[in-house]
Amino acid sequence: MCKFKKVDSKVILLTPQELSFINSCIKNYSKYFQDDFAFVPKNIFEIPKILPNNFWLVLNFYNKPMGFVYLDNFIGKETRLYSAELTTCFAKCAWGDFTKYSAKIFLKKCFDDFGLEKIKAQVYPDNFRVKNLLKICGFTHESTLQKETLRNGKPQNIEVYGLYRNYYYKK
Protein backbone atom coordinates (compact mmCIF):
# COMPACT_ATOMS: atom_id res chain seq x y z
CA MET A 1 0.00 0.00 0.00
CA CYS A 2 1.12 3.55 -0.64
CA LYS A 3 -0.09 7.04 0.14
CA PHE A 4 0.56 10.36 -1.52
CA LYS A 5 1.11 13.35 0.75
CA LYS A 6 0.42 16.53 -1.22
CA VAL A 7 2.92 19.22 -0.37
CA ASP A 8 1.83 22.81 -0.84
CA SER A 9 4.92 24.77 -1.84
CA LYS A 10 3.55 27.90 -0.16
CA VAL A 11 2.79 26.25 3.19
CA ILE A 12 5.43 23.62 3.85
CA LEU A 13 4.07 21.05 6.26
CA LEU A 14 6.89 18.56 6.08
CA THR A 15 8.58 17.05 9.09
CA PRO A 16 12.36 17.45 9.44
CA GLN A 17 12.65 13.74 8.58
CA GLU A 18 10.66 14.24 5.35
CA LEU A 19 12.75 17.26 4.37
CA SER A 20 15.90 15.28 5.08
CA PHE A 21 14.57 12.39 2.97
CA ILE A 22 13.84 14.67 0.00
CA ASN A 23 17.29 16.23 0.34
CA SER A 24 18.90 12.78 0.42
CA CYS A 25 17.01 11.67 -2.70
CA ILE A 26 18.06 14.80 -4.56
CA LYS A 27 21.71 14.35 -3.57
CA ASN A 28 21.77 10.63 -4.41
CA TYR A 29 19.73 10.60 -7.61
CA SER A 30 19.70 14.09 -9.13
CA LYS A 31 22.11 12.95 -11.85
CA TYR A 32 19.21 10.93 -13.25
CA PHE A 33 16.72 13.78 -13.48
CA GLN A 34 18.53 17.14 -13.40
CA ASP A 35 20.74 18.89 -15.91
CA ASP A 36 23.53 21.43 -15.41
CA PHE A 37 20.99 24.26 -15.07
CA ALA A 38 18.95 22.83 -12.18
CA PHE A 39 18.97 24.45 -8.75
CA VAL A 40 20.31 21.93 -6.25
CA PRO A 41 19.57 22.77 -2.60
CA LYS A 42 22.60 23.03 -0.34
CA ASN A 43 20.58 22.08 2.75
CA ILE A 44 17.07 21.06 3.76
CA PHE A 45 16.01 24.67 4.34
CA GLU A 46 16.41 25.44 0.62
CA ILE A 47 14.10 22.59 -0.45
CA PRO A 48 10.93 24.75 -0.43
CA LYS A 49 12.54 26.89 -3.17
CA ILE A 50 12.49 23.98 -5.61
CA LEU A 51 9.12 22.37 -4.88
CA PRO A 52 6.60 22.80 -7.68
CA ASN A 53 2.91 23.32 -6.86
CA ASN A 54 1.99 19.74 -7.73
CA PHE A 55 4.41 17.80 -5.54
CA TRP A 56 3.65 14.64 -3.57
CA LEU A 57 5.72 12.69 -1.11
CA VAL A 58 5.15 8.94 -1.59
CA LEU A 59 4.74 7.10 1.71
CA ASN A 60 4.51 3.39 2.46
CA PHE A 61 1.98 1.70 4.76
CA TYR A 62 3.98 2.83 7.81
CA ASN A 63 4.13 6.47 6.63
CA LYS A 64 7.81 6.12 5.79
CA PRO A 65 8.88 8.28 2.82
CA MET A 66 9.80 6.14 -0.18
CA GLY A 67 10.09 8.78 -2.88
CA PHE A 68 8.49 11.81 -4.44
CA VAL A 69 6.62 12.65 -7.63
CA TYR A 70 5.60 15.90 -9.20
CA LEU A 71 3.82 17.29 -12.22
CA ASP A 72 4.83 20.44 -14.06
CA ASN A 73 4.87 21.95 -17.56
CA PHE A 74 1.09 21.72 -17.88
CA ILE A 75 -0.46 22.36 -21.29
CA GLY A 76 -4.01 23.66 -21.46
CA LYS A 77 -5.90 26.06 -19.26
CA GLU A 78 -7.38 25.77 -15.79
CA THR A 79 -10.76 24.68 -17.09
CA ARG A 80 -9.30 22.11 -19.49
CA LEU A 81 -5.82 20.70 -18.93
CA TYR A 82 -4.46 18.53 -21.72
CA SER A 83 -1.08 17.26 -20.58
CA ALA A 84 1.60 17.49 -17.91
CA GLU A 85 5.13 16.29 -17.41
CA LEU A 86 5.92 13.77 -14.68
CA THR A 87 9.10 13.57 -12.60
CA THR A 88 9.78 10.82 -10.08
CA CYS A 89 12.49 9.93 -7.60
CA PHE A 90 12.42 6.90 -5.31
CA ALA A 91 14.87 5.68 -2.68
CA LYS A 92 16.68 2.46 -3.52
CA CYS A 93 14.64 0.53 -0.91
CA ALA A 94 11.49 1.30 -2.94
CA TRP A 95 12.76 0.08 -6.31
CA GLY A 96 10.82 -2.83 -7.74
CA ASP A 97 7.28 -3.80 -6.79
CA PHE A 98 6.63 -0.72 -4.65
CA THR A 99 7.49 1.71 -7.47
CA LYS A 100 5.41 -0.27 -9.99
CA TYR A 101 2.41 -0.34 -7.67
CA SER A 102 2.61 3.30 -6.58
CA ALA A 103 3.27 4.54 -10.14
CA LYS A 104 0.12 2.90 -11.51
CA ILE A 105 -1.98 4.35 -8.68
CA PHE A 106 -0.47 7.81 -9.12
CA LEU A 107 -0.95 7.84 -12.90
CA LYS A 108 -4.63 6.94 -12.58
CA LYS A 109 -4.94 9.64 -9.89
CA CYS A 110 -3.49 12.19 -12.34
CA PHE A 111 -5.99 11.26 -15.03
CA ASP A 112 -8.87 11.31 -12.51
CA ASP A 113 -7.97 14.45 -10.55
CA PHE A 114 -6.65 16.65 -13.36
CA GLY A 115 -8.64 15.28 -16.30
CA LEU A 116 -5.43 14.98 -18.31
CA GLU A 117 -5.37 13.35 -21.73
CA LYS A 118 -1.61 12.76 -21.70
CA ILE A 119 1.26 12.44 -19.24
CA LYS A 120 4.80 12.92 -20.51
CA ALA A 121 8.13 11.91 -19.05
CA GLN A 122 11.57 13.03 -20.16
CA VAL A 123 14.34 10.58 -19.36
CA TYR A 124 18.08 10.49 -19.88
CA PRO A 125 19.01 7.47 -22.04
CA ASP A 126 21.12 5.88 -19.27
CA ASN A 127 18.25 5.87 -16.74
CA PHE A 128 17.15 2.30 -17.49
CA ARG A 129 15.17 1.85 -14.26
CA VAL A 130 12.79 4.71 -15.02
CA LYS A 131 12.49 3.71 -18.69
CA ASN A 132 11.50 0.17 -17.65
CA LEU A 133 9.04 1.51 -15.07
CA LEU A 134 7.45 3.79 -17.67
CA LYS A 135 7.03 0.90 -20.12
CA ILE A 136 5.49 -1.32 -17.41
CA CYS A 137 2.99 1.50 -16.70
CA GLY A 138 1.99 1.79 -20.37
CA PHE A 139 4.19 4.65 -21.59
CA THR A 140 5.55 4.49 -25.13
CA HIS A 141 8.71 6.06 -26.50
CA GLU A 142 7.68 9.05 -28.64
CA SER A 143 10.95 10.69 -29.62
CA THR A 144 14.52 11.46 -28.71
CA LEU A 145 15.55 15.09 -28.42
CA GLN A 146 19.12 15.28 -29.68
CA LYS A 147 21.61 17.27 -27.58
CA GLU A 148 18.69 18.89 -25.76
CA THR A 149 20.57 20.03 -22.65
CA LEU A 150 23.92 19.95 -20.92
CA ARG A 151 24.75 17.36 -18.30
CA ASN A 152 28.18 17.36 -16.70
CA GLY A 153 29.17 19.97 -19.28
CA LYS A 154 28.37 17.73 -22.26
CA PRO A 155 25.42 17.76 -24.69
CA GLN A 156 22.78 15.29 -23.55
CA ASN A 157 19.96 13.58 -25.42
CA ILE A 158 16.58 13.27 -23.72
CA GLU A 159 14.08 10.52 -24.50
CA VAL A 160 10.40 11.51 -24.41
CA TYR A 161 7.76 9.00 -23.31
CA GLY A 162 4.00 9.46 -23.34
CA LEU A 163 1.00 7.82 -21.71
CA TYR A 164 -2.52 8.53 -22.92
CA ARG A 165 -5.73 8.53 -20.93
CA ASN A 166 -7.24 5.74 -23.03
CA TYR A 167 -4.65 3.32 -21.59
CA TYR A 168 -6.58 3.50 -18.30
CA TYR A 169 -9.99 4.30 -19.77
CA LYS A 170 -10.63 2.14 -22.82
CA LYS A 171 -13.26 3.73 -25.05
What are these regions (language model features)?
Residues 31-40, 128:
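Short, positively charged
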